[in-house]
């Protein structure tokens, strides 16, 4: 979820036939037709292909056949292990914030990673930039 900025529901609906090399095809829930594409980092794509192969998952079967509630528990337990309160959507938000703060253009974060319909949604989503961060970027720009 985190590396591809995918929503938990999108991840839970994925089947092997939805994975094309480094793309995850997100289908319209009503028609089943391709609605959006989430791009996968190479390591994620490699691990996902291996997971599908190692577990003998059929092309039409869900890769992660768990409920949303079960996914919440998995993510919560992972957060507990490192001492933070964590929900599935936090992973998507963190990935987008990390990309933005690492210098990825806001247009890429918005349209490609988050697949938002407008930049204004992404700006609200990413939140306010702290004074410390603003100063760091100014220093990076002007040495």
Question: Where are the regions that the model predicts?
Answer:
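Short pre-functional
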Residues: 1-7, 97-98
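Short basic/aromatic active-site micro-motif
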Residues: 84-103
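The alpha-helix within a helix-turn-helix
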Residues: 1, 12, 110
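Catalytic-site neighborhood detector that most strongly recognizes the C-terminal catalytic loop/helix
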Residues: 30-32, 113-139
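Active-site/catalytic core of tyrosine-dependent DNA strand-transfer enzymes
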Residues: 41-84
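Conserved tyrosine-mediated DNA breakage-rejoining catalytic core shared by Y-recombinases
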Residues: 4-50
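Short, polar N-cap/turn motifs at the start of nucleic acid-interacting alpha helices
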Residues: 19-21, 85, 105-124
């Amino acid at each position: 979820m985190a590396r591809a900025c995918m929503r938990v529901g999108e991840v839970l609906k994925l089947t092997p036939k939805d994975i094309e090399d480094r793309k995850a095809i997100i289908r319209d829930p009503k028609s089943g037709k391709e609605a959006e594409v989430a791009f996968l980092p190479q390591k994620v794509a490699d691990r996902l292909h291996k997971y599908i192969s190692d577990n003998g998952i059929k092309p039409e079967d869900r890769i992660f056949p768990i409920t949303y509630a079960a996914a919440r528990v998995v993510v919560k337990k992972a957060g507990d292990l490192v001492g933070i309160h964590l929900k599935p959507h936090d992973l998507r938000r963190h990935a987008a914030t990390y990309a933005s703060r690492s210098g990825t253009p806001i247009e890429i974060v918005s349209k490609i990673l988050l697949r938002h319909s407008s930049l204004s949604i992404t700006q609200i989503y990413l939140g306010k930039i702290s004074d410390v961060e603003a100063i760091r970027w100014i220093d990076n720009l002007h040495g």
